[in-house]
Amino acid sequence: MNTYAQESKLRLKTKIGADGRCVIEDNFFTPPFKLMAPFYPKDDLAEIMLLAVSPGLMKGDAQDMQLSIGQNCKLRITSQSFEKIHNTEDGFASRDMHIVVGENAFLDFAPFPLIPFENAHFKGNTTISLRSSSQLLYSEIIVAGRVARNELFKFNRLHTKISILQDEKPIYYDNTILDPKTTDMNNMCMFDGYTHYLNLVLVNCPIELSGVRGLIEESEGVDGAVSEIASSHLCVKALAKGSEPLLHLREKIARFTTQTITQKV
């Protein structure tokens, strides 16, 4: 059962406004969601912060998010803080998110890290639909638990799926299953002693594989790599012993990408 009286829903639709910048065309949300009005940190790039007025996700919480980024929009979506998944007891918390990015539109989806507490169980499913001219920078950062309390990999289970389609054809699928009961999370094929994991996907972004590799190599405290996926798109996987190194790496990649995109005439 959801902690709230109804399923938690968020709807956001954007378009190009009269001044040529991305604006909110329509939105709807139920508790605990809220939206901040867009602001414009650089040129025609809009930034919207998603707010969740709650201490975190609990047993039975179910979130349904639908985001539609209009044609020619340039938008960065952020969150207000680290997201906490509390003890879900014998249940789980879930999120289903569907994102549509229109023609010649750019979306930088940059939430803060996800922290599963002891005995937390979370299921996340994200589907992103793009056009051939859409540009996407999408990431998630997963933490091993409440690291400061030495509560590492004490969560029950964490399962996230990311599916990206371009013109209705699948170009990327990620199926992350972290189950400490059945897998040694410190195995060299898993976290290998690290506590924070970054998964970042770039589609049609104006940055070369060699450029991303250089940013990874110059990032202190980061063990990561970049690989090419379908049609020369890029995927970055990185580990660290804190959130800051991964957030800094992500920001460097995003800064290079958005500077190039917003400079286009």
UniProtKB/Swiss-Prot annotation:
Its main location: cytoplasm. It is found in: Cytoplasm. GO terms for molecular function: nickel cation binding. Keywords: Chaperone, Cytoplasm, Nickel insertion. GO terms for cellular component: cytoplasm. Pfam families: UreD. Disulfide bonds: none annotated. Belongs to the UreD family. Required for maturation of urease via the functional incorporation of the urease nickel metallocenter. UreH, UreF and UreG form a complex that acts as a GTP-hydrolysis-dependent molecular chaperone, activating the urease apoprotein by helping to assemble the nickel containing metallocenter of UreC. The UreE protein probably delivers the nickel. This is Urease accessory protein UreH.
